Design a protein with these regions (language model features):
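Short, low-complexity disordered leader/linker segments with a strong preference
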Residues: 1-59, 345-347
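Residue-level signal for nonpolar/aromatic packing positions in well-ordered secondary structure
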Residues: 29, 58, 67, 74, ...
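N-terminal (or domain-start) structured segment
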Residues: 47-138, 176, 201-225, 316-318, ...
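An extracytoplasmic/periplasmic, membrane-proximal ligand-sensing/linker region
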Residues: 55-57, 197-198, 203, 287-347
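Extracytoplasmic/secreted proteins, especially bacterial periplasmic and envelope-associated proteins
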Residues: 72, 76, 80, 84, ...
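Hinge/capping helix and adjacent helix->loop/strand transition within the periplasmic-binding protein
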Residues: 108-114, 128-214, 275-308
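Ligand-binding pocket segment of bilobal, Venus flytrap-like solute-binding proteins
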Residues: 176, 180-184, 188-260
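C-terminal lobe and pocket-closing loops
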Residues: 233-301, 333
């Protein structure tokens, strides 16, 4: 059979068209597989990045000296977090400048989750005091750790049995009664000054650079007539009968000393309590913060951890890490105003 030229040409065109279609299908398949592979790879890498943290040792910076309440809570937390995270958590103390040195070190550390920090209430005062440039805004909070009520204490043989007794004596002899406190601008002193202003009295405030321990020693030695102290520092003296507690300068009663009235309840509004939290520097990835928050929540809610806190003189304090930043910033603004009002300074 002999084909016409037009029929032969049509056959060639048909073959050519099939080859083009086949090539196009091949290209589509190649790009489709590549896209799927890329998507799968991207998903896997994201999951892998999340699941891999933490992979190495974590450093926990405590901005206050070894041996104190902040150091104690930092070491308790580090040991518990090791069990939750499966890596070593090592505490490094960086005291100085009213916690300013350590807070600056935490805020300026690499925001990769391998440096976390204990954040004391001083983060709300160090800037106004001139000790550092950090504020609560420079951190993302893992969890709150505890709170410490600020107390006005006197020796067991003191003539004063209540805050009203102290106020009456101060009104009779303005500025003659001495009270020791743990350094200029500390949370206890700020609460004390607010209470004195509300009561309309004046005490001779003696600041001790050695902290609350030095103030207690001075009171027990008769060098000052009363002192401010946190529950963690005072509880053993109270239990042994060496101290009387006239009032709690915090806004709420202490779970450890529920029968001690707050100054606010007595009509003299103030909030001189201290607290502690754990945080990472601002800019830390959200997935890393999430891992730390979940672990921190487990630690803080564990019964054995709560029991240890109570034994050490700390009250429980649970505020969501994400929400706590707002609370801390409010405290920062309030304390900054008090520091300016009373012209307090580290210098």
């Amino acid at each position: 059979m002999v084909l016409s030229k037009s029929h032969a040409k049509g056959g060639k065109d048909m073959k050519k068209m099939k080859r083009v279609v086949a090539m196009l299908l091949a290209v589509v398949m190649v790009f489709g597989l590549a896209a799927c592979g890329s998507k799968k790879s991207g998903d896997d890498s994201g999951k892998e990045e999340k699941s891999n943290y933490p992979e190495k040792q974590i450093t926990l910076i405590c901005p206050l000296a070894a041996g104190g309440g902040s150091d104690t809570i930092s070491r308790l937390f580090a040991a518990a977090m090791e069990k939750e995270l499966g890596v070593s958590v090592v505490v490094e103390n960086k005291p100085g400048a009213g916690a300013g040195v350590g807070l600056e070190a935490i805020a300026s550390s690499n925001p990769d989750g391998y440096t976390i920090g204990y954040i004391p209430a001083e983060v709300t005062t160090v800037e106004a005091m001139g000790n550092a440039t950090v504020t609560p805004e420079d951190f993302e909070y893992i969890c709150t750790a505890m709170k410490i009520s600020a107390l006005i204490c006197v020796p067991a043989d003191s003539e004063w049995d209540s805050l009203d007794d102290l106020i009456a004596a101060a009104k009779e002899n303005p500025g003659s009664i001495t009270i020791g406190t743990a350094g200029v601008g500390n949370a206890y002193e700020l609460g004390l000054r607010s209470m004195l202003e509300a009561a309309g009295i004046e005490l001779n405030i003696v600041n001790f650079s050695g902290g609350t321990a030095e103030a207690i020693t001075a009171m027990m030695g008769g060098n000052v007539q009363c002192c401010t102290a946190g529950t963690a520092e005072a509880i053993s003296y109270v239990n042994s009968g060496e101290f009387k507690v006239l009032c709690n300068l915090s806004s709420e009663p202490s779970e450890l000393l529920p029968d001690v009235p707050t100054a606010t309840e007595l009509g003299y509004e103030c909030n001189g309590g201290s607290w502690g939290a754990f945080a990472v520097p601002a800019g830390t990835p959200d997935d890393v913060i999430e891992v730390l928050r979940k672990a921190g929540e487990k630690v803080m809610n564990a019964d054995d951890f709560k029991k240890t806190l109570s034994e050490k003189g700390f009250d429980e304090y649970h505020v969501d890490g994400a929400e706590f930043k707002k609370d801390a910033m409010e405290m920062y603004k309030t304390n900054s105003d008090i520091i300016k009002e009373f012209n307090l300074s580290a210098n």
